[in-house]
From Swiss-Prot:
Recorded catalytic activity of this chain's protein: 5-methyltetrahydropteroyltri-L-glutamate + L-homocysteine = tetrahydropteroyltri-L-glutamate + L-methionine
Protein name: 5-methyltetrahydropteroyltriglutamate--homocysteine methyltransferase
InterPro entries documented for this protein: Cbl-indep_Met_Synth_N, Cobalamin-indep_Met_synthase, Met_Synth_C/arc, UROD/MetE-like_sf
Active site, UniProt feature: H694
Protein task: Catalyzes the transfer of a methyl group from 5-methyltetrahydrofolate to homocysteine resulting in methionine formation.
Binding site for 5-methyltetrahydropteroyltri-L-glutamate: R17, E18, L19, K20, K117, R515, C516, W561, E605
Enzyme Commission number: 2.1.1.14
Amino-acid positions noted as binding L-homocysteine in the UniProt annotation, renumbered to this chain: I431, G432, S433, E484, D599
Presence of keyword Amino-acid biosynthesis: yes
Gene3D superfamilies (UniProt xref): 3.20.20.210
Record's cofactor remark: Binds 1 zinc ion per subunit.
Length: 753
C-alpha cells in the first residue's frame, strides 16, 4: 500500500499579493475583467506547479476563490439574494463582488451580505442567505472550469467542494423563519450534477469538506448526513473531510456514511489514531492531517512519524495538512530579514508541502534519517534564551485577584466620567482608524526602507494626525481619535513594540476578499520595553479641547490575530500581553488621556469549537482584559470594541469585562445583535454600529436615524453611543466624510427629538 500525500488547499493571494492588487484594480475601474481573470489563471497554475515541485501527489482544485469559498459555493448553487441579481437573471463575477462588497463595476449597489469568521480561524466568509421555498440550480461553473485547467496542465487533480450540510449550517434564514435544513433535498440535485460532471472528466477522488462534523451538532443535523450522502454516492470516490477539531464524538454518524475515505485533523483533534483505525470501515482510506495548516512552525516530523507508523500497511493511508494551507503564509524562503536561528523554527505553506513529502517518503521506506535532520531546530528551540524571560514569568506568577478589579463599580465610575466629560446625549465617535491614504502608506514605507529619516517621518505623521483632528472637529464628532496614521495593522503595530514577537516581510494571509494581514509571530515571553501609543495620543489631545481616545488592541485579540507559540498555553500568552498593556493604560492616563479603548474584536471568535470547552477559555479571556484595564481610575472611561460577533451565548462574559462602553458591529445584522443586550439587561453603555464600513456605500441620515430609533427600543437612549461598525482605514476620505456627516446629523436630529 503506497502512501500518498496531499494538501487540503493552498494560499490564493500570491506571494506578492497579486490577487489583491488585481481585485482592487478591477474594482477601481483601472483594469478589465479579462485582466483580472488572467491573474487568477496565472496564480492557480503557479500554485499547482509549486505544490507539485515541493512533492505533493494530489493537487487541490477548487480551493481558489475570488472572494471566499463559501460565497463561491453560493453562486455554484444559484443562491444569489434578489438585491444582487442581474436583471437578466445571469450570474457573473460582479454578482459575486456585489454580494461580498455591496457594489461592483456593473450592477446596482445593494447592502453586502453579512460576513463572519470561518469557524475559529482569522479567515472570513459571506454568510449564505436562505428564504422559504428557495430554488437552487447549477449556476456558476468555476469549479469545473478550474478542474479543466488543471487537467490540461497534466496535474493529478483532487477537486475540493464544500459539503451540503456544512453549507446549510453556515447560512442564515432571511424573512419568514423556517428550518434551513429543510432545503437539503433542494440543493442535493446540484451536488449530484457537479459530481456527475467531475466523473465525466475522469476524476477519481473528490474532497468534500464537512467541517461541521467536528462541532456539537443538534441531532437533526447529524441525522441529515446519512440521507445526504446516500444521494451523493456512486459517481466518484468521496473523501469526507473534517478539520479544526477531532471527530471521535461524531464517529458513529461518520462511519455510517457511504463514502470511501475520511480526512481527520490530527493536530487540533484529540483523536487517537489507533482508535480511528479500529472504528473506521476497513476499506476506507484514512487521510491523516499531521502537518498543521494553521501555524508557521516547523513540524517535529519524528513525532508525526511515531503518531501514524503503527497503522502503516494496515489500511490505505494518505498524509496531509490538517486543514487548508490558506491560513499559512506562502514561502519562508523569501524572508531575508529573519535571523537564522529564528527562521529555522518556521515552515510556511511551501515548506509544509516539503514536510509532507519527507513524511510520505519516510513512511514508505522506513528510513527516518531525513525526519530527524529536519526536526533538529525544534529540539534546539526548547533551550533558546530568545524564548524565556524570567522577569516576565515571575510577574505573571505574582498576579492576584485584585489585579483584575476596577476600584469601583460601573455606576460610581459613570458618575465620575459624566462629570469629567460632559458629553451630549447620543454622543458620536469613531472606532479608531481613518483612511490609510497612499500618502500615509508611502510615508511609512519610505521610513521602513530607510528612505526617510526619523524627523521627517514624525513630522509627516504629526501632520496626518492634525488633519484627522481637524476633520473630526469640522464634522462635529464628540469624542475624537488620532486616526492611527502611524499604524500599519492593529495587531502588527503592537507586536512591533513588544518583546517576544517577530515579523515577516511577506508573511501575508487572506482575511477576506482582497484584505490580507501579516500576523506577528509570538516566539517567546512577552513584555513592553517602552511606551507604545502615549506620544501620539498626547500630541492629538494637545490639538483639541474635546476628548481624544487612546487606542489599544486587547490581549486576546493580539493573541488570536498572531501566530502563537505552541510550547505554552494561550492563557499564558494572553496574560503576558495583558500585563504589558496594563502599563500602557497607566502611562496613557498619566499623560492626560481620559478615554481609553481596548479593542477585543476577537474575544468571541477565539472560542473553542465545542461549547463544552468554552467556560475555561472565557474565564481566562475575560481575566486578561480586566488585568489590562483595571489599573484605570474611576473617571477614566474604558471602551472596548467587538465586531462580527453574536453575543447572546456569551453575554455573561461580555458583562464581566466591565468596560464602561462597548461598541459593536450591528448594521449588517440590522441591529439584531442588540436583542442579546436587551434580554440580558446589559448594564453599561453601548455603541451599536450604525453603518457598514466594509462597503463603500454611504448611508443616508434617515437610514441611520431609523437604526438608532430601533436601537433605542432595546437599550435606554441615555446609554447609547453613535458610531460606525468598525475602523475606517480601508475606506476613502470622500465616502468617510459623507457617511460621518450623515451619522452626526442623525445624532443631532435625535437630540432635538
Amino acid at each position: 500500500m503506497t502512501i500518498l500525500n496531499h494538501t487540503l488547499g493552498f494560499p490564493r493571494v500570491g506571494l506578492r499579493r497579486e490577487l489583491k492588487k488585481a481585485q482592487e484594480s478591477y474594482w477601481a475601474g483601472n483594469s478589465t475583467r479579462e485582466e483580472l481573470l488572467t491573474v487568477g489563471r496565472e496564480l492557480r497554475a503557479r500554485h499547482w506547479d509549486q505544490q507539485k515541485q515541493a512533492g505533493i501527489d494530489l493537487l487541490p482544485v477548487g480551493d481558489f476563490a475570488w472572494y471566499d469559498h463559501v460565497l463561491t459555493t453560493s453562486l455554484l448553487l444559484g443562491n444569489v439574494p434578489p438585491r444582487h441579481q442581474n436583471k437578466d437573471g445571469s450570474v457573473d463575477i460582479d454578482t459575486l463582488f456585489r454580494i461580498g462588497r455591496g457594489r461592483a463595476p456593473t450592477g446596482e449597489p445593494a447592502a453586502a451580505a453579512e460576513m463572519t469568521k470561518w469557524f475559529n480561524t482569522n479567515y472570513h466568509y459571506m454568510v449564505p442567505e436562505f428564504v422559504k421555498g428557495q430554488q437552487f440550480k447549477l449556476t456558476w461553473t468555476q469549479l469545473l472550469e478550474e478542474v479543466d485547467e488543471a487537467l490540461a496542465l497534466g496535474h493529478n487533480v483532487k477537486p475540493v467542494l464544500l459539503g451540503p450540510v456544512t453549507y446549510l449550517w453556515l447560512g442564515k434564514v432571511k424573512g419568514e423563519q423556517f428550518d434551513r435544513l429543510s432545503l437539503l433535498n433542494d440543493i442535493l440535485p446540484v451536488y449530484q450534477q457537479v459530481l456527475a460532471e467531475l466523473a465525466k472528466r475522469g476524476i477519481e477522488w473528490v474532497q468534500i469538506d464537512e467541517p461541521a462534523l467536528v462541532l456539537e451538532l443538534p441531532q437533526a443535523w447529524l441525522d441529515a448526513y446519512k440521507p445526504a450522502y446516500d444521494a451523493l454516492q456512486g459517481q466518484v470516490k468521496l473523501l469526507l473531510t473534517t478539520y479544526f477539531e477531532g471527530v471521535t464524538p461524531n464517529l458513529d454518524t461518520i462511519t455510517a456514511l457511504p463514502v470511501q475515505g475520511l480526512h481527520v485533523d490530527l493536530v487540533h483533534g484529540k483523536d487517537d489514531v489507533a482508535e480511528l483505525h479500529k472504528r473506521l470501515p476497513s476499506d476506507w482510506l484514512l487521510s491523516a492531517g499531521l502537518i498543521n495548516g494553521r501555524n508557521v512552525w516547523r513540524a517535529d516530523l519524528t513525532e508525526k512519524y511515531a503518531q501514524i507508523k503503527d497503522i502503516v500497511g494496515k489500511r490505505d493511508l494518505w498524509v496531509a495538512s490538517s486543514c487548508s494551507l490558506l491560513h499559512s503564509p506562502i514561502d519562508l524562503s523569501v524572508e531575508t530579514r529573519l535571523d537564522a536561528e529564528v527562521k529555522s523554527w518556521f515552515a510556511f505553506a511551501l515548506q509544509k508541502c516539503h514536510e509532507l513529502a519527507l513524511l510520505r517518503d519516510a513512511l514508505n521506506s522506513g528510513d527516518t534519517a531525513a525526519l530527524a535532520e529536519w526536526s533538529a531546530p525544534i529540539q534546539a528551540r526548547r533551550h533558546s534564551t530568545r524564548v524565556h524571560n524570567p522577569a516576565v514569568e515571575k510577574r505573571l506568577a505574582a498576579i492576584t485577584a485584585q489585579d483584575s478589579q476596577r476600584a469601583n463599580v460601573y455606576e460610581v465610575r459613570a458618575e465620575a466620567q459624566r462629570a469629567r466629560f460632559k458629553l451630549p446625549a447620543w454622543p458620536t465617535t469613531t472606532i479608531g482608524s481613518f483612511p490609510q491614504t497612499t500618502e500615509i502608506r508611502t510615508l511609512r514605507l519610505d521610513f521602513k526602507k530607510g528612505n526617510l529619516d526619523a524627523n521627517n517621518y514624525r513630522t509627516g505623521i504629526a501632520e496626518h494626525i492634525r488633519q484627522a483632528i481637524v476633520e473630526q472637529e469640522r464634522l462635529g464628532l464628540d469624542v475624537l481619535v488620532h486616526g492611527e496614521a502611524e499604524r500599519n495593522d492593529m495587531v502588527e503595530y503592537f507586536g512591533e513594540h513588544l518583546d517576544g514577537f517577530v515579523f515577516t516581510q511577506n508573511g501575508w494571509v487572506q482575511s477576506y476578499g482582497s484584505r490580507c494581514v501579516k500576523p506577528p509571530i509570538v516566539i517567546g515571553d512577552v513584555s513592553r520595553p517602552a511606551p507604545i501609543t502615549v506620544e501620539w495620543a498626547k500630541y492629538a489631545q494637545s490639538l483639541t479641547d474635546k476628548p481624544v481616545k487612546g487606542m489599544l488592541t486587547g490581549p486576546v485579540t493580539i493573541l488570536c490575530w498572531s501566530f502563537p507559540r505552541e510550547d505554552v498555553s494561550r492563557e499564558t500568552i494572553a496574560k503576558q500581553i495583558a500585563l504589558a498593556l496594563r502599563d500602557e493604560v497607566a502611562d496613557l492616563e498619566a499623560a492626560g488621556i481620559g478615554i481609553i479603548q481596548i479593542d477585543e474584536p476577537a474575544l468571541r471568535e477565539g472560542l473553542p469549537l465545542r461549547r463544552s470547552d468554552w467556560d475555561a477559555y472565557l474565564q481566562w479571556g475575560v481575566e486578561a482584559f480586566r488585568i489590562n484595564a483595571a489599573v484605570a481610575k474611576d473617571d477614566t472611561q474604558i471602551h472596548t470594541h467587538m465586531c462580527y460577533c453574536e453575543f447572546n451565548d456569551i453575554m455573561d462574559s461580555i458583562a464581566a469585562l466591565d468596560a464602561d462602553v462597548i461598541t459593536i458591529e450591528t448594521s449588517r445584522s440590522d441591529m439584531e445583535l442588540l436583542e442579546s443586550f436587551e434580554e440580558f439587561d446589559y448594564p453599561n453603555e453601548i455603541g451599536p454600529g450604525v453603518y457598514d464600513i466594509h462597503s463603500p456605500n454611504v448611508p443616508s441620515v434617515e437610514w441611520i436615524e431609523a437604526l438608532l430609533k430601533k436601537a433605542a427600543k432595546r437599550i435606554p437612549a441615555e446609554r447609547l453611543w453613535v458610531n460606525p461598525d468598525c475602523g475606517l482605514k480601508t475606506r476613502g476620505w470622500p465616502e468617510t466624510r459623507a457617511a460621518l456627516a450623515n451619522m452626526v446629523q442623525a445624532a443631532q436630529n435625535l437630540r432635538r427629538g
